[in-house]
Amino acid sequence: MAQAYDAGGAGGGDNRTKDLIATVSAIANSLMNEVGKVIIGKQENLRRVTVGILSNGNMLLEDFPGLGKTMLSNTFAKALGCKFKRVQFTPDLLPSDIMGTYMYDQKTGEFKLRAGPLFCNILLADEINRAPPKTQAALLEAMEEKQVTIEGITHKLPAPFVVLATQNPIEQEGTYPLPEAQMDRFLIKMSMGYPDRSEEKAILARRKLRGKDDHDVLQITSPKKVVAMQKALETVHVDPAILSYVVEIVQRSREDHRIINGCSPRASQNLFKSSRAAAAIDGRDYVIPDDIKSIALQICSHRIVMKPEAKIRGITGMHIMRKILSEVPVPVIQPA
């Protein structure tokens, strides 16, 4: 049976909280609208990236080349007013190439930090699965800790610091699959996918109208405001019934006989904070079950490790999560 909880109590924040979330919603939707002028027909993915940024999480995009991953990242960075860097990962890329190193300054007689591309707000880590494991580990440590250690000295990375990593499908030649422990550090995994006929025609029509390859993108907000919006999510109410719903989803991912590993506690924490972001985008200061369902597949599926026999049959973490979401009783909102 569906479990009921009191939506009135869930949404019972004070006026200051409601105003704060209304501001977050307005900025987030303006951001998606601005990016949507460049990225055609991918509204669900724009929302997922916005959820990821508000949740201060990192995202993994698995796609073939040419599907707009760089444009997506760069456009978001411009609209956010954030510093953007792109690193093309290759088999010979070293950790120091992305973190930076100390160089001797002959004028001052001192060693000075030559910061690498990690020192930015939005980093596109392109084809991360072409880099050797040591360099992958250096990036993933920066993602988790929001800091890097260079020659024994720890440096905080700028805030916000969000990584959009891309990887080619693992069957492609010359790739190093990310270990399960590292996959778990990505808040969201998603795919851009090919545009359909109408979307691709719209892309060409807009290119013709622009008269140039580049896109003009308005700055919607600033890094300082992004950090403030991330902090504002702490005011979004999460009812105990919603917490139980999250726990049940994650627990069931560990119980299926076809899996080796299910979702970790990090998955439940990520569902928790991302549901707050989803609620805020919709202008609510409380979470509803649909907020969980809207992001659970992208947050949980990549964390599930299937048994070999299940892989052979074509069963994936996405199949497991769809089954779980269809079976777990959903809390029903009842007006106060």
Residue ranges, per PLM feature:
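Walker A/P-loop
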Residues: 53-90
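Conserved AAA+ ATPase core "coupling" helix
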Residues: 95, 99, 175-248
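Conserved alpha-helical scaffold flanking the Walker A/P-loop in AAA+ ATPase domains
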Residues: 47-51, 104-124
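AAA+/SF3 P-loop NTPase mechanochemical coupling elements
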Residues: 112-121, 150-167, 178-188, 266
